[in-house]
């Protein structure tokens, strides 16, 4: 589980602290390496891949410091 102290302040927390909804934010925030996943868990994304994309137009991009995952995919570390 991610360290709750590293999650950006603007993240919306789920009722269950085991499950966190976190969106990547534009640097310099140190927690900008966290992204939203299908199950709502924040995972580090230094190296990542998309497993089992399940939504239409699932995409991952990293341009100009912005990192987005669209439409329900599972992100995991290599």
Swiss-Prot record:
It comes from the Bacteria. Keywords: Plasmid. This is Uncharacterized protein YuaW. It comes from Escherichia coli (strain K12). The lineage of its organism: Bacteria, Pseudomonadati, Pseudomonadota, Gammaproteobacteria, Enterobacterales.
């Amino acid at each position: 589980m991610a360290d709750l102290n590293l999650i950006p302040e603007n993240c919306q927390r789920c009722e269950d602290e085991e499950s966190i909804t976190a969106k990547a934010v534009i640097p310099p925030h140190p927690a900008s390496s966290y992204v939203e996943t299908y199950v709502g868990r924040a995972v580090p994304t230094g190296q990542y891949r998309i497993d089992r994309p399940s939504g239409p137009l699932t995409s991952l991009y990293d341009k100009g410091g912005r990192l987005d995952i669209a439409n329900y995919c599972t992100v995991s570390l290599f």
